């Protein structure tokens, strides 16, 4: 079970040019997205904590994304 609805994931995949997308493909993409966001958030949290903050900022997210 995923936390993200499948329909928006399906639309994102189709927006990249795919004409048809299987439900399995959308579910797999959803799992990858959730894992990526969790990893990115963990890295952003480390950056905020290192800076002495409890709040993650947009800059933390952007910096963490550059490290990936």
Predicted regions mapped to residue ranges:
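Terminal helix-to-tail segments of small alpha-helical proteins
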Residues: 1-68
């Amino acid at each position: 079970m995923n936390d993200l609805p499948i329909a928006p994931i399906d639309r994102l995949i189709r927006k990249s040019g795919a004409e048809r997308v299987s439900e399995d493909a959308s579910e797999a993409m959803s799992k990858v997205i959730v894992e990526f966001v969790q990893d990115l958030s963990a890295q952003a949290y480390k950056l905020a904590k290192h800076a002495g903050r409890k709040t993650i900022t947009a800059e933390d997210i952007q910096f963490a994304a550059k490290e990936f």
